[in-house]
Every structure is written in structure tokens, then in C-alpha cells.
Regions:
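Metallocofactor- and cofactor-centric catalytic cores in central/energy metabolism, strongly enriched
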Residues: 1-222
């Protein structure tokens, strides 16, 4: 319910600041969750939003709540962990006489704090990259996957991290990952991880090697 209000705040602020001059932009991350969610669903939504607040590329953040959602702003703040109060603000719309005016004012305060931030060189060893399956097509095994494989080799060789998920899609091509393990302990962990997933499939009477298509198996086998 608060998405429309947040969009009004964003639009007005951008108009008043010449599109937030001197920054990479002001982005609105709206979503349809927060109300009527319980248990793990609620925790997952809150955790995802909190991770976005703490993201190192976020110069400043305004967290907006309507006031009646399950994902209460006070609980969100209390479970957020450490944060810079000059760069992370919170607003409950039902506590404001004019929520748009109050939100725009908060954005101006945040803007003054972060508008002069400058990029500085960093170390590759400080970065973590998540690899996402973009869907299989005719070029996956020719360009995309080999490129990500070489990219991962380069990042890891320089102390960085890449994260590869979707273990069942490794079936039939797991030996490629195993050949990249840095030591016997890592190799054994990889074997255990893959075999545990295979046993899970078997326990539920599911075929193991039919998960990746022939095309995907070929694509995986040609990647690094």
C-alpha cells in the first residue's frame, strides 16, 4: 500500500534536485510483500530488504512503511544490525501529517550526507559475485558459461569469491567443478554436496541425470 506514496516522494525529490545531481541515481525498490506474511515468508522478505539496506553500493537509504504491515518498521530497524543513522533513515507514514513532504525532507537530509561521496580503488579479494542462470540458449556453452568460468578463475586466483548455485544442474558435469577444487578437503566437500542432492532425488523417486537437458549437459561439459 505504501508503494504509491514512495513513488511520489521519489518523483518530487528528483524534480527538486535536478535528478539527484552528483549521484548515480535514486532508486525505488517497491514490492508486494510485507502484509499478511507469516513465518519464514515474512523473515525472508525482511532479510532481503535488510540486505539491500546494508548493501555497500547504497550511499543512503530511506526505509518507508505504512504502519499497519506485518513487516513493522520498528522491528525492521531493531533487527537490522549495525548501520549509520546519518545514512539510513526510517519513516512510518501513519505518523506523519504529510507523508510525502516528510519523505522528501528526509531524502534531502540523506542527499546532503552522501552527495559528495567519491569512488575509491578497492581490492578484488574484498568482492563476492553471485552467478545467476540466465536460461539455456544456443550460445550458453559457446560464450556465456565459458566466460563466467574464466571470470571465476580470475576472481578466485586474486582472492575474491564467486558463488555458484543450482546444484542439481551440475549433475553429469560435476567433475569439472571437482577438477577446480584447491585441495582434497574442498574436493571431498564438493563430492558430498553433489551426492547429497543425488540421494535426495533418489529418495523422492526422481531421475538424477534427466534434470539437465542434452543441450545443457553439453553446455556444462564445455565450461570451466
Amino acid at each position: 500500500c505504501v508503494n504509491g506514496i514512495a513513488r511520489q516522494i521519489q518523483t518530487r525529490f528528483l524534480k527538486e534536485t535536478n535528478n539527484a545531481e552528483g549521484t548515480d541515481g535514486v532508486h525505488l525498490f517497491s514490492h508486494t510483500y510485507g502484509c499478511s506474511q507469516l513465518g519464514d515468508d515474512h523473515i525472508n522478505t525482511r532479510t532481503m530488504l535488510q540486505n539491500m539496506v546494508r548493501h555497500p553500493n547504497a550511499g543512503a537509504v530511506l526505509v518507508i512503511g505504512l504502519g499497519c504491515e506485518n513487516n513493522q518498521v520498528d522491528a525492521f530497524r531493531d533487527t537490522l544490525g549495525e548501520f549509520d543513522p546519518e545514512r539510513v533513515h526510517f519513516m512510518v507514514c501513519q505518523h506523519q501529517d504529510d507523508e510525502v513532504e516528510a519523505g522528501v525532507e528526509q531524502l534531502h537530509q540523506l542527499y546532503e550526507v552522501m552527495r559528495h561521496d567519491k569512488r575509491e580503488p578497492g581490492k578484488l579479494s574484498e568482492l563476492k559475485f553471485g552467478l545467476e542462470c540466465g536460461g539455456s540458449d544456443g550460445l550458453s556453452g559457446i560464450t556465456a558459461n565459458p566466460m563466467l568460468g574464466r571470470f571465476s578463475d580470475y576472481v578466485i586466483a586474486n582472492g575474491g569469491t564467486t558463488v555458484l548455485t543450482e546444484v542439481p544442474e551440475m549433475f553429469g558435469a560435476e567433475r569439472i567443478l571437482m577438477s577446480h577444487c584447491r585441495d582434497e578437503e574442498t574436493f571431498e566437500k564438493t563430492v558430498t554436496m553433489v551426492n547429497d542432492f543425488k540421494q535426495y532425488f533418489i529418495a523422492h523417486n526422481q531421475p538424477i541425470y534427466e534434470n539437465p537437458s542434452d543441450r545443457k549437459s553439453t553446455r556444462l561439459n564445455s565450461s570451466h
